[in-house]
From Swiss-Prot:
PTM (free text): Undergoes a tyrosination/detyrosination cycle, the cyclic removal and re-addition of a C-terminal tyrosine residue by the enzymes tubulin tyrosine carboxypeptidase (TTCP) and tubulin tyrosine ligase (TTL), respectively.
Entry-annotated residues carrying N6-acetyllysine: 40
Intrachain S-S bonds: none
SMART domains xrefs: Tubulin, Tubulin_C
Protein known as: Tubulin alpha-1 chain
Organism of origin: Gossypium hirsutum (Upland cotton)
Keyword Metal-binding: yes
Compartments in which it is found: Cytoplasm, Cytoskeleton
């Protein structure tokens, strides 16, 4: 078995997690109390969904997940919500006081007290797996818990489970919409550890997803529930090949093999198509070629950056539903001929495709239409550097005046950590710049260095 353990940290991580588990349950026909009427074998069979759920002797299916927050309100919603019976009480870990949007509180003072408990619970989940494949980590880097405790947990996971792959689904601050003043600090400090301790990070950004909801689903004022349901479709498509059988299955470890050319360059853009409301769906023919094209549209990207400004290094297309390899090959061939979609010249093939026969499921009363086929794209593009340069710029403006720094120093950080993290990100921007440069030009310069 190739089990995956999901770790949801902080408010953003937990709320995205709620949307994901709600969707997984619907996809597998698991009721909110964990019973699965269609599953006749008691105890673990070899069905594919055991990658995400474990089964008790009483026939109850329990998610292989853990929810952590430093303050109780968000986790209490899970404890009292529709799916309260789904989770084992020990999987929901909440502290008493908030990280207060402060990376240092999440990482040093308050996070330190709770991290061993989390690792203990993760250890129990891991012992329950026959062949643990890796971790999916959900968090946001703007707040205190997601950034501070999130990076602390990742660092500790690297120590305890060094070889297991870690996929991050990370909510980054948006260009215009801000939820806290110190977002740039938290993001830079947190990215510093994401760089080292995740294998692949998928960037999400609320503003980009708001725009998709507003434009494609005609929701005038999208709520976080709307956003999370869209994000959960992406994550479900990514993990569908682990949970269902298909023609071309994609493994979690395959993402890192196919998408990451150099260890540091592992921040991905994601997009999903078709994002379409029920009213429109009946009037459109959504062929494989069409959904593939719309997945490459800059407006479909779930982070605010324009892939036309950069080059693609690799991309992974996960199709689900009524899709055959012939259509996929034709669609990919068309994409390759487009002028607007440029690939780095050292990566001529650049496509990894997966096909899964399970059509996309929609949440009843949700915004998305039920469609026959969908595609989710995870791409590694040099334009992601825009996200970092935007945050770095805001960081510099504040840090030049040392604004708000005393809150971090007071919780046991040193100013040196700020400059170290900032230098690391400057190096990352430089890395992206170099990877995007044409290799033909690079060859002439290198010849001078050889002795």
């Amino acid at each position: 078995m190739r089990e995956c353990i999901s770790i949801h940290i902080g408010q953003a991580g937990i709320q995205v997690g709620n949307a994901c588990w709600e969707l997984y349950c619907l996809e597998h026909g698991i009721q909110p109390d964990g019973q699965m009427p269609s599953d006749k074998t008691v105890g673990g069979g070899d069905d594919a969904f055991y990658t995400f759920f474990s089964e008790t002797g009483a026939g109850k299916h329990v998610p292989r997940a853990i929810f952590v927050d430093l303050e109780p309100t968000v986790i209490d919603e899970v404890r009292t919500g529709t799916y309260r019976q789904l989770f084992h009480p020990e999987q929901l870990i909440s502290g008493k006081e908030d990280a207060a949007n402060n990376f240092a509180r999440g990482h040093y003072t308050i996070g330190k007290e709770i991290v061993d408990l989390c690792l203990d619970r993760i250890r129990k989940l891991a012992d329950n797996c026959t062949g643990l494949q890796g971790f999916l980590v959900f968090s946001a880097v703007g707040g205190g818990t997601g950034s501070g405790l999130g990076s602390l947990l990742l660092e500790r996971l690297s120590v305890d489970y060094g070889k297991k792959s870690k996929l991050g689904f990370t909510v980054y601050p948006s260009p215009q919409v801000s939820t806290s003043v110190v977002e740039p600090y938290n993001s830079v400090l947190s990215t510093h550890s994401l760089l080292e301790h995740t294998d692949v990070s998928v960037l999400l950004d609320n503003e980009a997803i708001y725009d998709i909801c507003r434009r494609s689903l005609d929701i005038e004022r999208p709520t976080y529930t709307n956003l999370n349901r869209l994000v959960s479709q992406v994550i479900s498509s990514l993990t569908a090949s682990l949970r269902f059988d298909g023609a071309l299955n994609v493994d979690v470890t395959e993402f890192r093999t196919n998408l990451v050319p150099y260890p540091r360059i592992h921040f991905m853009l994601s997009s999903y198509a078709p994002v379409i409301s029920a009213e429109k769906a009946y009037h459109e023919q959504l062929s494989v070629a069409e959904i593939t094209n719309s997945a490459f549209e800059p407006s479909s990207m779930m982070a605010k950056c324009d892939p036309r400004h950069g080059k693609y290094m690799a991309c992974c297309l996960m199709y689900r539903g009524d899709v055959v390899p012939k259509d996929v090959n034709a669609a990919v061939a068309t994409i390759k001929t487009k002028r607007t979609i440029q690939f780095a010249d050292w990566c001529p093939t650049g496509f990894k495709c997966g096909i899964n026969y399970q059509p996309p499921t929609v949440v009843p009363g949700g915004d998305l239409a039920k469609v026959q086929r969908a595609v989710c794209m995870i791409s590694n593009s040099t334009s992601v550097a825009e996200v970092f340069s935007r945050i770095d710029h805001k960081f510099d403006l504040m840090y030049a005046k040392r604004a708000f720094v005393h809150w971090y120093v007071g919780e046991g950080m040193e100013e040196g950590e700020f400059s170290e993290a900032r230098e690391d990100l400057a190096a990352l921007e430089k890395d992206y710049e170099e990877v995007g440069a044409d290799s033909a030009e690079g060859d002439e310069e290198d010849e001078g260095d050889e002795y």
